[in-house]
Amino acid sequence: MAALWILLASFLFSLMGAAVKLASNEYSVAEIVFYRGLVGIILLYLFIRHQGGKLRTEHLPGHLWRGGIGVVSLWMWFYAATKLPLATAVTFNYMSPIWTAVAMIGFAWWQGKERIALPLLAAIAVSFGGVMLALRPAFEAQQWFGALMALLSGVLAAVAYTMVRRLSRAGEPEYRVVFYFLAVNIAAGAAGSLLPGGSPDGAAWHAHSLRGASLLLFIGASGVFAQMALTRAWRTGKVLVVANLQYTGIVFSSVWGILIWHDVFDWHVWLGMALILASSVAATFYNTLTEKRAAAARADST
C-alpha cells in the first residue's frame, strides 16, 4: 500500500508543478507561494480538527527554521519551474540525495577520516555529468539562472528533510510540521509580494480570473494532499522502496511537459536526466544503508 501512496504523492506533486508553471502567467512567484500556503493551511486545519490533533508545540524554533529553509527551497523551485522545462526543473530539484552524499563526504573529510566511500564518489561524479548534459539547452537559451535556482532548491530541500527528521524524532507529528511550514509560506509569500520588485510588472497583488483562481486552489490542494500521501508512504513503507518510487515524479513531469508545452529534448538531455536519476537512486540506497549501519552500531553500544 505504501507504494501506491508514494505514487499518488509523486503524481500530485507533478500536477502541482504543472499548475505553478501555468499560474505564473497571471501571478508572481511570491503570490503563488502565498496562496499555496493559504489554501493548504485551511484544508490541513480542517483535517486536524477532524482528527482531534493539537497545534501547540514545544519546538517552535525548530519549526520556524525548517519552515524558513523549506520556503526558500520551494520559492527557488517555483521560480525554476516558470523558467525551465518542467521535467528539467523537477530533475534538478530531486537531487537531494546527491547533496546529502556530498555533505556526508565533506563531514568525513572534516573529521579526518581517511576512508571515503567510493560508491558515493561515483554517484556524485555521474550525477554532475548528468547535470552538465541536461544543462546544455538551458545555457544556450539563457536560462542558466533558472537552472541555478533549481539546483540550489535541491540543496536546501536536503537540509529541510534533515530538519523534518529531527522534529519527528522529537515527537512532532507530521501534520504539525506541515502546518507550520504552510504558515511560513503565507508570511514569506505576503512579504515577497509587498517588497519592491516582488512582481515583474510591479503589482503587489493581481486580480483573479476564474482560470487563475482555479489554478491557485489546485496548487494549494494538490500540495497538501501530496504531502499527506507522502507522509503516509514514509510511515508505512520501506525506506528504499518509498525513496526510489518518488522519482516517478520526473516521469510524470516529463509527460505534462510534452502534452502541455510540447517540450522536445535532444538525446543528451534525456541521457543527463537518466544519469541524475540513476545516481540519485544509488545515493539513496547507500545513504539508507549507512544510516541503518549507524543505528545498529548505536544499538549494540547501549
Residue ranges and their predicted role:
Residues 89-95, 171-184, 224-259:
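Helix-helix packing/entry segments at the starts of transmembrane helices
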Residues 1-31, 125, 141-166, 296-302:
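Glycine-/small-residue-enriched transmembrane alpha-helix faces in small-molecule transporters
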Residues 1-9, 49-78, 145-153, 203-225, ...:
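Loop-to-transmembrane-helix transition segments
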Residues 44, 138-201, 207-208, 299-302:
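Transmembrane alpha-helical segments that form core, pore/gating elements
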Residues 102, 116-136, 268-287:
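Hydrophobic transmembrane alpha-helices of multi-pass small-molecule transport proteins
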Residues 247-302:
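C-terminal-most transmembrane helix of multi-pass membrane proteins
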Residues 79-82, 97-119, 251-270:
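C-terminal transmembrane-helix exit sites in multi-pass transporters
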Residues 1-2, 27-72, 99-103, 126, ...:
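Transmembrane alpha-helices of multi-pass small-molecule transport proteins
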